Each structure stands twice: as C-alpha cells, then as structure tokens.
Amino acid sequence: ASGGGVALIRIADKKAMFYAKPGGNPHSAEVLPDGNVVVASSTGNLLSVYVYNGADSYVSRPAFTMPVHSAHNVVWDRKRGCLWTATGAQLLKLAYNGKRTAPELTQVRSYDMAAGNTDAHDLAPVCGEDAMYVSTNQHVYKFDCAAEKFLDVQIFQQNTIKSISTGPEGYSTIVMRPTSGGSNWWSAEVCDMKGNRLFNRCLLYTSDAADE
C-alpha cells in the first residue's frame, strides 16, 4: 500500500496473521512454502523476505532483500518450486533456498517480452492452467510456464491493464484498469475480458506506473 505497510488477513475471522512495513509502496505479497512472506515494493525497487513463525504477527524487518527494479508482483510456482516476478519487459525466475530462518532468493533465468514493452505490472496465475497472465503498460500476455513462451491474449484493451484475476469454470476472468476522467491509480469499475462492466462505482485502487 502507499503507506508502506503489508498485511496477511485470514478471511474466516478477519484476523491479521502477519503485518510489516517494508516501505517503498508495497504492491504484492506471497506466502512461501515454509510460511515466510515475500513482498514486492515498487518505489523501493526490491523484494523483501520476512521470517514468519506464526507466534508474532508483527515482523519488524526483513531477513533478506533483493533489488528488483519497480517490483510490482510475486507468484510462487508450486509445480516448479520457484518464485516468479515481472519487471520492466522481463519475467524473472527466482530460486528460493528454503531456509526459513536464513532465506535467500537468487535469479535463475530471465525471459524477455517483445520490444516496446515497459513497466510490467500484474502477474497472476491462470486458474486451471500451467500459465500466468502478465501485463505491461502496452500489452497483456499469457506466459506458458511449460513451453516458456509469451502468448498473445484476446482482451478488450491491451494497454494499462493493472490487474487480472481468474477463477474456476463458471466465473468470469476479471480485469481492472484506470478509468478515464479520474485519478490514474483508481478504477471505478471491474470488467470481464470483453470489457463488460461487472461492478460500477467501486473506487478500487489499481496502482499505476506513475507511482512506481
């Protein structure tokens, strides 16, 4: 969040299970297999790994940090046992050492997107597929994790898509973008992949390249 904080909330009882203040405009967080939490901070240009033992919800400082320019996203890949993050016009594959009290991340490989892409923003697993959606300021891709290829996506708008979320069969894939006439980090609607509005006047925060 723009205030610099991050929290993990248990939906069942709304309890804050974990919270910290990495600063640098945190945009995304992911729980690692050992329970530790990794946070992507955009203006901080880094990933922060926090040791979480389940006893104390507040963790004052990260155990490990890794520079990643304009870090906006992190996704754990259970099948491959790796962490993904997209930055600029690249998708990075990271290895996690699995040491809960001494965590480390290292880059294994990078995958380049097409020329002209800038400011990667969202990275989201595609429900039921071995793939992830990746959005930049100019384009939306589906990355096939097995084939290691970026695929074009049929969507009502390619540029400035800030968030994509999928669900099981019967649920729409939902998309968020900054809405015209307002602040460029807010959206007043949620759409499907064809641009049909599913919710209106919801005033949801989407973030934007300007706040990176």
Residue ranges of model-derived segments:
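Conserved beta-strand positions in repeat-built beta-propeller and related beta-rich domains
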Residues: A1-G3, V39-T43, L83-A89, M132-N137, ...
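A short beta-strand motif characteristic of beta-propeller blades
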Residues: K15-A20, V59-T65, Q107-M113, L151-Q154
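Beta-rich catalytic cores
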Residues: N25, S70, D119
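Short coil/turn segments that connect the beta-strands within blades of beta-propeller domains
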Residues: D34-N36, K79-G81, E129-D130
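Short loop/turn segments immediately following beta-strands, especially the blade-tip
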Residues: Y52-D56, A95-A102, C145-F150
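Conserved blade-ending motifs and adjacent loop-strand segments that build the rim/top face
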Residues: D152-P168
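Conserved small/polar residues in nucleotide/adenosyl-binding loops
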Residues: Y205-E212
